[in-house]
Every structure is written in structure tokens, then in C-alpha cells.
């Protein structure tokens, strides 16, 4: 499993992202501990645990703490490179929406698109190795 930490600037303030990929059941505790560290509530931790231990392919999750400006995103294993790319784009969309909502940005506005691009650019060095 790869753990990637990236930071983007949003409205002049940092937003920290921890990404895990590709998930296996051996890494569930580390991911749950990371979610707990950003104050993921009990219900969401239980949902995340079920998601992470379900051994599902083409699956992910994204949780953000808007106050701490921290996100944990997880990309499970996938059935093929195209599906893995789809999974990454899907979870990055959730992440961009979380950041937009935390900053009162218009979801239809350009700012959200730039945020999505900043995230993609920051995560590219790892993602490019996994989409082959």
C-alpha cells in the first residue's frame, strides 16, 4: 500500500490530504487510525471499517474534516486500469466538493475545477504508477 501526503492551498490556507492506494485488508487499522486522527465520528468510522473490510474491488472512500482542513481518501484495488482511473476521478470529485463546501464555493464555479486540478497534479506522481 502507498500512503501519500499532499497539501494544496485553498483561499490562501493549506488543505492536507492523506491518500491510501491500493488498499488491502492488511492496512485497515492504519487507515482507521488516520480517520480517527482527523476526528472522524463513530458512525462514519464504522461505515469506513465495513467499507474497508468488505474486500470489494473498484471501491473507495473520502472523509474530510472541514474545520481541520484535512481529508483522508482511500482507493481500493481495481479490476483494470480504466476502472482504477475511474475510481480515482470519482473520489477526487468527492474531495473537491468537500473543499468547496467547506469554503462556501459555488459548486458550478471555476474555483472547484481549479481545486480538482490542483489535487490531481499533486497526486499524479503516485497515480501514474498505478494506472498501467
List the predicted regions and their residue ranges:
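Catalytic Zn2+-binding segment of zinc metalloproteases
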Residues: 92-108, 112
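Active-site scaffold of zinc-dependent metalloenzymes
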Residues: 36-82, 95-98
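Short, solvent-exposed segments of well-ordered alpha helices
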Residues: 79, 83, 104-107
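Post-HExxH zinc-binding segment in Zn-dependent metallohydrolases
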Residues: 106-132
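Short alpha-helical catalytic segment bearing the HExxH-like zincin motif
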Residues: 83-91
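Generic hydrophobic, helix-prone segments enriched in Leu/Val/Ile
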Residues: 16-20, 95-100, 119, 123
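Non-catalytic terminal regions of proteins
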Residues: 1-53
Amino acid at each position: 500500500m502507498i500512503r501519500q501526503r499532499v497539501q494544496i492551498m485553498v483561499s490562501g490556507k493549506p488543505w492536507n490530504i492523506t491518500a491510501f492506494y491500493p488498499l488491502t485488508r492488511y492496512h485497515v487499522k492504519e487507515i482507521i487510525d488516520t480517520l480517527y486522527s482527523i476526528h472522524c465520528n463513530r458512525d462514519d468510522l464504522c461505515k469506513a471499517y465495513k467499507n474497508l473490510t468488505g474486500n470489494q474491488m473498484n471501491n473507495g472512500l473520502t472523509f474530510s474534516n472541514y474545520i481541520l482542513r484535512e481529508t483522508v481518501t482511500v482507493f481500493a484495488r481495481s479490476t483494470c486500469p480504466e476502472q482504477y482511473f475511474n475510481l480515482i476521478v470519482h473520489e477526487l470529485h468527492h474531495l473537491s466538493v468537500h473543499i468547496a463546501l467547506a469554503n462556501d464555493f459555488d459548486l458550478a464555479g471555476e474555483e472547484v475545477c481549479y481545486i480538482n486540478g490542483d489535487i490531481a497534479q499533486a497526486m499524479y506522481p503516485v497515480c501514474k504508477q498505478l494506472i498501467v
